[in-house]
């Protein structure tokens, strides 16, 4: 398992905690998703990628789908608020929503959504675009 984060402080913390917890076959990597998605070591190498709600879904798709193998899955946890359309990003990045479920976390009143996207084909080398572009000009 690879944990990817653009913030070095978080990665350093995770790398300190992983051995303390006795976790095996897990590592934290300091890298932006846009760069990781282009790196041969990570591109289309994972059966599954997951992300928390750090960006709108169309941007998350561009960040995460490059890591997922063909026929693999991307799982996003989002808030329950209505969101802008991400159909264009799904089509461009070869994804199809297989499951969307709304739930409430225990001891919380906040609803969350889990969105599971299956990747149906290999990704064009156009994606992910350079750092910052997905946010400035979303699909």
Annotate each predicted stretch with a short phrase.
Residues 10-12, 82-86:
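Short alpha-helix immediately C-terminal to the canonical SAM-binding loop
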Residues 34, 56, 79-83, 105:
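Short "lid" loop at the C-terminus of a central beta-strand within the Rossmann-like core
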Residues 46-66, 75-76, 80:
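A short SAM/SAH-binding and catalytic strip from SAM-dependent methyltransferases
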Residues 87-139:
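SAM/dcSAM-binding transferase cores
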């Amino acid at each position: 398992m690879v944990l990817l984060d653009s913030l070095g402080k978080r990665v350093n913390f995770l790398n300190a905690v992983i051995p303390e917890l006795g976790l095996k076959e897990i590592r934290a990597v300091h890298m932006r998703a846009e760069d990781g998605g282009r790196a041969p070591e990570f591109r289309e190498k994972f059966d599954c990628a997951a992300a928390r709600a750090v960006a709108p879904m169309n941007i998350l798709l561009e960040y995460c789908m490059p890591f997922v193998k063909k026929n693999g899955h991307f799982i996003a946890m989002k808030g329950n608020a209505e969101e802008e359309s991400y159909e264009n990003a799904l089509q461009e990045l070869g994804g199809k929503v297989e499951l969307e479920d709304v739930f409430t976390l225990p001891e919380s009143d906040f609803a969350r959504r889990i969105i599971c996207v299956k990747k149906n084909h290999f990704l064009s080398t156009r994606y992910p675009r350079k750092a910052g572009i997905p946010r400035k000009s979303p699909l």
